Amino acid sequence: MDVEERLKLVTRNAVEVVTEEELRQLLEEKEEPVAYVGFEPSGKVHLGHKLVIDKMIDLQEAGFHVIILLADLHAYLNEKGTLEEVRELADYNRRCFLAMGLDPNKTEFVLGSEFQLDEDYALDVYRMARHTTMRRARRSMDMIARSEENPPVSQVVYPLMQALDIVHLNVDLAVGGLEQRKIHMLARDVLPKLGYDSPTCLHTPIIHGLDGDEKMSSSKNNFIAVDDEPEVIREKLRKAYCPAREAEGNPILEIYRYFIFREYDEVTIERPEKYGGDVTYTSYEELERDFVDGELHPLDLKENAAGYLSEILKPVRKAVSAPS
């Protein structure tokens, strides 16, 4: 795989790379660069997580070594539970992520508290605090913070630590959903002041909640868990927001775009003959066009999405139900 092929794979379904020139140079200079993403072990693993894990799988196929940070201290700072509770969830996260298709030989799982309590790391937190305003630290947490009103000081420490994770894990590429962008830009601006390189960052889309909310979240109960049973998936999708002829912010269409067409070269929408019969698509764009034109009914999209998604998530259900 040449550099152009690797670049195309890395940027597939990404919202942005900061910067693409840096990414290209990285691919030209390193056969096995290191990419990382961090997750708070809290609540259910859902399609929002899978969207990012799928990108890490792309990165592995493009030659990257992948680090998955199970950010127990971050979850604690963000009021997601006690340290004991979030650490118990870390193994559940690991099993789900591997079952989604990560190559175990190219994946390194790191618990945040394994290195974030070290003296050098702590000193860097203090150094970074000297170069970061309170306003900027708070602003970087806009789409992440658990408490938006009267937040605790811990939510100011959080983005400083996330920026420092990049250098203390020796990462070449920092990956995250678009909600992480402000923290990554903070890292790019401030880390050079501490003598570190400005990190290259890649951002994935934010999938909408099933209720049409701007973000799928376990705390809002508007999600498909990756270990949901088929009948649960079907019931959730039947109730999901899917306005006829509207593509913008439509979670059902996003499921087709980011998950179903990723796994299938052809997607067949099965429906009764009196409503036009079965129709097969070879690209997401064709399906979206027909939906916007009124050729596809929301219920037909939902029913067929449930079948495809249940099959895609089958390995995860099997892994989670097996003894740990």
From Swiss-Prot:
InterPro entries: aa-tRNA-synth_Ic, Rossmann-like_a/b/a_fold, Tyr-tRNA-ligase, Tyr-tRNA-ligase_3, Tyr-tRNA-ligase_arc/euk-type, Tyr-tRNA_synthase. Gene3D superfamilies: HUPs, Tyrosyl-Transfer RNA Synthetase. It catalyses: tRNA(Tyr) + L-tyrosine + ATP = L-tyrosyl-tRNA(Tyr) + AMP + diphosphate + H(+). Keywords: Aminoacyl-tRNA synthetase, ATP-binding, Cytoplasm, Ligase, Nucleotide-binding, Protein biosynthesis. GO terms for biological process: tyrosyl-tRNA aminoacylation. One of its GO terms (cellular component) is cytoplasm. This is Tyrosine--tRNA ligase. The gene is tyrS.
